[in-house]
């Protein structure tokens, strides 16, 4: 059976989300149709707001409200200014913040080096990290928190080679994070132990 065009478009929109196949997209579309109009309006406004009222912090690359740049973490002078935790995305920042154990700064790459995907160092938020480190001599350590997969390891090793001549300590998250695992899926205790047991690259 062919669905009316508005439903077909809605289903197609849902299938563009990660992990959503045609069956789940169809269920979501019909669930949306069953919502009252006010909830649908709120939902659509939230989607639009997420795209128009958010930006990336001009210092660290973390996601922030357009009227809060630099982000609240970069503005917080009580944080340890000597340590920068490099992560792949903003979800990783939230995962670390939820541990309440790390009190330094962050730098969000918004990607990883992936030759197979044609993504090089210049395609992610690496140039701004190098510039940031050169402008702030108080930064003494970079903790590399990229995920424990091939792309994450490649990015970590690239960073280590790049920063070693500058005399900045480059460390990597330690035990507890399984190979292939993502930081934002790890529990808080595992993340705390991984940071505490970090090793030099």
UniProtKB/Swiss-Prot annotation:
What are the protein's UniProt keywords? DNA damage, DNA recombination, DNA repair, Metal-binding, Zinc, Zinc-finger
* CDD domains recorded: TOPRIM_recR
Q: Residue ranges of the Toprim domain? A: 82-178
The organism's superkingdom is given as Bacteria
* Zinc finger (C4-type) in chain: 57-74
**InterPro entries the record matches:** DNA_Rcmb_RecR (IPR000093), Rcmb_RecR (IPR023627), Rcmb_RecR_Znf (IPR015967), TOPRIM_dom (IPR006171), TOPRIM_RecR (IPR034137)
Give an example GO molecular function. zinc ion binding
**What biological-process GO terms show up in the record?**
DNA recombination; DNA repair
- A Pfam family found in this protein is Toprim_4
Coiled-coil intervals in this record?
A: none
Q: What PANTHER family is this protein classified in?
A: RECOMBINATION PROTEIN RECR
Q: Which family does it belong to?
A: Belongs to the RecR family.
Q: What does this protein do?
A: May play a role in DNA repair. It seems to be involved in an RecBC-independent recombinational process of DNA repair. It may act with RecF and RecO.
Q: What is this protein called?
A: Recombination protein RecR
Ranked from the top, the taxonomy reads: Bacteria, Bacillati, Bacillota, Bacilli, Lactobacillales
């Amino acid at each position: 059976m062919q669905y009316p065009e508005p439903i077909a478009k809605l289903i197609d929109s849902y299938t563009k989300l990660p992990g959503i196949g045609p069956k789940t997209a169809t269920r979501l579309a019909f669930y949306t149709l069953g919502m009252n109009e006010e909830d649908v309006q709120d939902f659509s406004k939230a989607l639009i707001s997420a795209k128009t009222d958010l930006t990336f912090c001009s210092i660290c690359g973390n996601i922030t409200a357009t009227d809060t740049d630099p982000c609240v973490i970069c503005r917080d002078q009580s944080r340890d200014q000597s340590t920068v935790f490099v992560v792949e995305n903003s979800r990783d920042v939230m995962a670390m913040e939820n541990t309440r154990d790390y009190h330094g700064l962050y730098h969000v790459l918004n990607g990883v080096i992936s030759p197979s995907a044609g993504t090089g160092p210049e395609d992610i938020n690496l140039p701004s990290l190098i510039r940031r480190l050169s402008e702030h001599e108080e930064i003494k350590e970079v903790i590399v928190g990229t995920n424990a997969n091939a792309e994450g390891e490649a990015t970590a090793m690239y960073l280590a080679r790049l920063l070693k001549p500058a005399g900045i300590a480059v460390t990597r998250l330690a035990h507890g994070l399984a190979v292939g695992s993502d930081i934002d899926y790890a529990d808080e205790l595992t993340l705390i132990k991984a940071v505490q047991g970090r090793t030099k690259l």
